[in-house]
Design a protein with these regions (language model features):
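Aliphatic-rich helix starts adjacent to a transmembrane/signal segment
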Residues: 31-52, 61
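Extracellular/periplasmic head regions of type IV pilus-like filament subunits
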Residues: 66-130, 134, 143-144
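N-terminal cationic amphipathic segment used for targeting or macromolecule association
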Residues: 19-22, 28, 36, 88, ...
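Sequence-pattern detector for short linear motifs
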Residues: 8, 40-44, 51, 90, ...
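Alpha-helix exit/C-cap motif
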Residues: 52-73
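N-terminal single-pass transmembrane signal-anchor helix
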Residues: 4-32
Protein backbone atom coordinates (compact mmCIF):
# COMPACT_ATOMS: atom_id res chain seq x y z
CA UNK A 1 0.00 0.00 0.00
CA UNK A 2 1.09 3.49 -0.78
CA UNK A 3 1.06 6.14 1.90
CA UNK A 4 0.06 9.45 0.26
CA UNK A 5 0.56 11.80 3.21
CA UNK A 6 1.36 15.32 2.08
CA UNK A 7 2.78 18.13 4.18
CA UNK A 8 5.68 18.78 6.51
CA UNK A 9 6.70 16.83 9.55
CA UNK A 10 6.88 18.46 12.95
CA UNK A 11 10.69 18.31 12.89
CA UNK A 12 10.82 20.16 9.55
CA UNK A 13 8.55 22.90 10.88
CA UNK A 14 10.65 23.30 14.03
CA UNK A 15 13.85 23.55 11.95
CA UNK A 16 12.30 26.30 9.82
CA UNK A 17 11.18 28.20 12.94
CA UNK A 18 14.66 27.93 14.47
CA UNK A 19 16.24 29.30 11.27
CA UNK A 20 13.77 32.20 11.23
CA UNK A 21 14.50 32.95 14.90
CA UNK A 22 18.26 33.03 14.20
CA UNK A 23 17.75 35.40 11.26
CA UNK A 24 15.54 37.67 13.37
CA UNK A 25 18.14 37.71 16.16
CA UNK A 26 20.76 38.85 13.66
CA UNK A 27 18.60 41.52 11.99
CA UNK A 28 16.96 43.21 14.98
CA UNK A 29 20.14 44.90 16.32
CA UNK A 30 20.97 46.19 12.84
CA UNK A 31 17.47 47.56 12.40
CA UNK A 32 17.55 49.42 15.72
CA UNK A 33 20.69 51.20 14.51
CA UNK A 34 18.87 52.31 11.37
CA UNK A 35 15.89 53.45 13.44
CA UNK A 36 18.16 55.61 15.64
CA UNK A 37 19.80 57.14 12.57
CA UNK A 38 16.38 57.91 11.10
CA UNK A 39 15.29 59.61 14.34
CA UNK A 40 18.48 61.70 14.32
CA UNK A 41 17.89 62.73 10.71
CA UNK A 42 14.28 63.65 11.53
CA UNK A 43 15.28 65.93 14.42
CA UNK A 44 17.99 67.53 12.23
CA UNK A 45 15.39 68.22 9.54
CA UNK A 46 13.06 69.80 12.10
CA UNK A 47 15.94 71.87 13.50
CA UNK A 48 16.69 73.12 9.99
CA UNK A 49 13.06 74.22 9.74
CA UNK A 50 13.44 76.08 13.04
CA UNK A 51 16.68 77.74 11.87
CA UNK A 52 15.08 78.85 8.60
CA UNK A 53 11.98 80.17 10.40
CA UNK A 54 14.17 81.94 12.97
CA UNK A 55 16.30 83.55 10.29
CA UNK A 56 13.20 84.64 8.36
CA UNK A 57 11.62 86.35 11.38
CA UNK A 58 14.93 87.87 12.48
CA UNK A 59 15.50 89.22 8.95
CA UNK A 60 12.03 90.74 8.89
CA UNK A 61 12.63 92.52 12.20
CA UNK A 62 16.26 93.46 11.45
CA UNK A 63 15.34 95.02 8.09
CA UNK A 64 13.02 97.49 9.83
CA UNK A 65 15.64 98.66 12.34
CA UNK A 66 18.67 100.95 12.23
CA UNK A 67 21.98 99.47 11.11
CA UNK A 68 23.58 97.45 13.90
CA UNK A 69 20.39 97.09 15.94
CA UNK A 70 20.29 94.05 18.18
CA UNK A 71 17.58 91.45 17.78
CA UNK A 72 16.41 89.53 20.83
CA UNK A 73 14.63 86.19 20.64
CA UNK A 74 12.71 84.71 23.54
CA UNK A 75 9.39 84.15 25.24
CA UNK A 76 9.28 87.49 27.07
CA UNK A 77 7.09 90.32 25.86
CA UNK A 78 10.23 92.46 25.48
CA UNK A 79 11.73 90.07 22.91
CA UNK A 80 11.71 91.32 19.33
CA UNK A 81 11.08 87.83 17.92
CA UNK A 82 8.98 85.36 19.91
CA UNK A 83 9.84 81.66 20.09
CA UNK A 84 6.14 80.83 19.68
CA UNK A 85 6.13 82.71 16.36
CA UNK A 86 9.19 80.74 15.23
CA UNK A 87 7.54 77.46 16.22
CA UNK A 88 4.37 78.40 14.35
CA UNK A 89 6.27 79.38 11.19
CA UNK A 90 8.49 76.27 11.32
CA UNK A 91 5.46 74.02 11.88
CA UNK A 92 7.25 71.79 14.39
CA UNK A 93 5.88 70.01 17.45
CA UNK A 94 9.03 69.87 19.58
CA UNK A 95 10.45 72.40 22.03
CA UNK A 96 12.64 75.31 20.95
CA UNK A 97 14.87 75.82 23.97
CA UNK A 98 16.87 78.78 22.73
CA UNK A 99 17.65 80.88 19.69
CA UNK A 100 20.67 83.19 19.66
CA UNK A 101 21.27 85.99 17.18
CA UNK A 102 24.70 87.49 16.46
CA UNK A 103 25.60 91.10 17.07
CA UNK A 104 28.10 93.54 15.59
CA UNK A 105 31.38 93.32 17.48
CA UNK A 106 33.89 96.09 18.13
CA UNK A 107 36.56 94.16 16.20
CA UNK A 108 34.62 94.46 12.96
CA UNK A 109 33.57 90.79 12.88
CA UNK A 110 29.86 90.95 12.32
CA UNK A 111 27.24 88.29 12.71
CA UNK A 112 24.55 90.91 13.25
CA UNK A 113 21.16 89.61 12.28
CA UNK A 114 22.40 86.05 11.78
CA UNK A 115 20.98 83.18 13.79
CA UNK A 116 24.10 81.77 15.46
CA UNK A 117 22.64 79.04 17.67
CA UNK A 118 19.41 77.07 18.00
CA UNK A 119 18.62 74.32 20.50
CA UNK A 120 15.62 72.16 19.57
CA UNK A 121 14.26 69.04 21.29
CA UNK A 122 11.72 66.50 20.06
CA UNK A 123 10.97 62.93 21.15
CA UNK A 124 13.95 62.75 23.51
CA UNK A 125 16.48 63.95 20.93
CA UNK A 126 18.15 67.36 21.27
CA UNK A 127 19.70 68.99 18.23
CA UNK A 128 21.98 72.01 18.51
CA UNK A 129 22.63 74.19 15.46
CA UNK A 130 25.77 76.29 15.67
CA UNK A 131 26.69 78.84 13.02
CA UNK A 132 30.17 78.29 11.48
CA UNK A 133 30.69 74.95 13.22
CA UNK A 134 33.08 72.82 11.15
CA UNK A 135 33.96 69.84 13.32
CA UNK A 136 32.06 67.34 11.17
CA UNK A 137 29.08 66.70 13.46
CA UNK A 138 26.50 66.54 10.67
CA UNK A 139 27.48 69.98 9.41
CA UNK A 140 26.40 72.55 11.95
CA UNK A 141 23.85 70.22 13.54
CA UNK A 142 24.78 68.11 16.57
CA UNK A 143 22.24 65.55 17.83
CA UNK A 144 22.38 64.06 21.31
Amino acid sequence: MKNNKKGFTLVELIVVLVILAILAALLIPALTGYIDKAKNKAVVAETRQVVMASQTLVDEYYAKQAVGAEVTVGTETTSNVKIDDIKKLAEVKGTITSVEVGTTSTTGNTNAGIVTKVVYTNKGKTCTYTYEKTDGTDGAYDVK
